Amino acid sequence: MADDQFPGWHGTTIIGVKKGGEVVIAGDGQVSLGQTVIKGTARKVRRLSPGGYHVVAGFAGSTADAFTLLERLEAKLEATPGQLARASVELAKDWRTDKYLQKLEAMLIVSDGQDMFVITGAGDVLEPEHDVAAIGSGGNFALAAARAMMDSDKSAEEVARAAMAIAADICVYTNGNLTVEKIAK
């Protein structure tokens, strides 16, 4: 997540990798406030199961804001069962137009095992090119590393873990304590 978008806020890396019939979303565990590590074992990747429809989501940004958005996404998925794209667009529209939601500082990567999207507060619902998406302070490092490995024989999980390890080595706001969730269609 760009520091200029959320001044004074740093920290976290989330990656989504779609390969071999599955999607893996992985996130580091570091929570930073300024130059201080507050926690190293946070879980920023979650499973959602509204109405028995399974989705994995990873978030970067304010935890409280992200949980608010995840709750809204669950409600949208309950209203549009099995339609992650539609639920994501509806969430992004609300996020963009609702005065309360506009103030939320977070980004999401979501997947149902078939589709994967990055959802932003600017109203974007982006389906990543090259089957890799990454957000957060180390997102560009993880994205570049994962894209370099996509043609290898590594599984989606191996690509995600290796890319996160590289990001953690480069980005001071990212650690190697990973939460990894897999989902397949």
Curated annotation (Swiss-Prot):
UniProt key word Iron: no
GO cellular component: HslUV protease complex; proteasome core complex
GO biological process entries: proteolysis involved in protein catabolic process
Location in the cell: Cytoplasm
E.C. number(s) listed in UniProt: 3.4.25.2
Record text on activity regulation: Allosterically activated by HslU binding.
One Pfam family recorded for the sequence: Proteasome
Active-site residues per Swiss-Prot or TrEMBL entry: 12
Catalyzed reactions: ATP-dependent cleavage of peptide bonds with broad specificity
Alphabetized UniProt keyword annotations: Allosteric enzyme, Cytoplasm, Hydrolase, Metal-binding, Protease, Sodium, Threonine protease
InterPro entries membership: ATP-dep_Prtase_HsIV_su, Ntn_hydrolases_N, Proteasome_sua/b, Proteasome_suB-type
SUPFAM superfamilies given in the database record: N-terminal nucleophile aminohydrolases (Ntn hydrolases)
EC class (word): hydrolase
Binding site for Na(+): 168, 171, 174
Function noted in UniProt: Protease subunit of a proteasome-like degradation complex believed to be a general protein degrading machinery.
Similarity comment: family membership: Belongs to the peptidase T1B family. HslV subfamily.
UniProt xrefs under PANTHER family: ATP-DEPENDENT PROTEASE SUBUNIT HSLV, METALLOPROTEASE TLDD
Subunit and partners: A double ring-shaped homohexamer of HslV is capped on each side by a ring-shaped HslU homohexamer. The assembly of the HslU/HslV complex is dependent on binding of ATP.
Identification of the protein by name: ATP-dependent protease subunit HslV
Species whose genome carries this gene: Ruegeria pomeroyi (strain ATCC 700808 / DSM 15171 / DSS-3)
Gene name for this UniProt entry: hslV
